[in-house]
Design a protein with these regions (language model features):
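Short, charged/polar N-terminal "headpieces" of proteins
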Residues: 1-28
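Active-site- and interface-proximal helix/loop "cap" or "latch" segments in soluble metabolic
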Residues: 21-91, 95-97
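Residue-level detector of a single, highly conserved position within proteins
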Residues: 107
Length: 107
């Protein structure tokens, strides 16, 4: 199992994503906990089992989470939660190496 903490910034809705690879067909089971109602509704609507290829091996801004967000999320293009869910899935399914990522403001 792979677990990541996603700190989105000023909204304060920290998200915890957990991914567990299934043994067949590059499927992954995801659990995402967040105080954000939009993220909660997304996970409720999409379910918890996904093709790792459909989540990770897509062009930027595509895949099931971005497609849902484009239709249902409030306007906030910089929300890092979906990228965090994707990184968690990549690492769990051996589609990318584990490495922290971040956005840091510099003076």
């Amino acid at each position: 199992m792979t677990k990541v903490r996603i700190e989105p910034g000023i909204c304060g809705f920290t998200a915890i994503a957990e991914a567990e690879a299934a043994e067949e067909d590059f499927m992954v089971h995801l659990r995402v906990a967040s105080g954000c109602a939009a993220v909660q509704e997304m996970m409720k609507a999409l379910g918890s089992t996904f093709s790792a290829f459909a989540v990770c091996l897509t062009r930027p801004g595509t895949g099931p989470f971005y497609a849902y967000a484009a239709e249902h999320f409030p306007v906030h293009a910089a929300c890092p939660v979906i990228a965090g869910i994707t990184k968690c899935t990549e690492a769990e399914c051996d589609l990318a190496l584990r490495q922290d990522a971040g956005i840091f403001f510099e003076e």
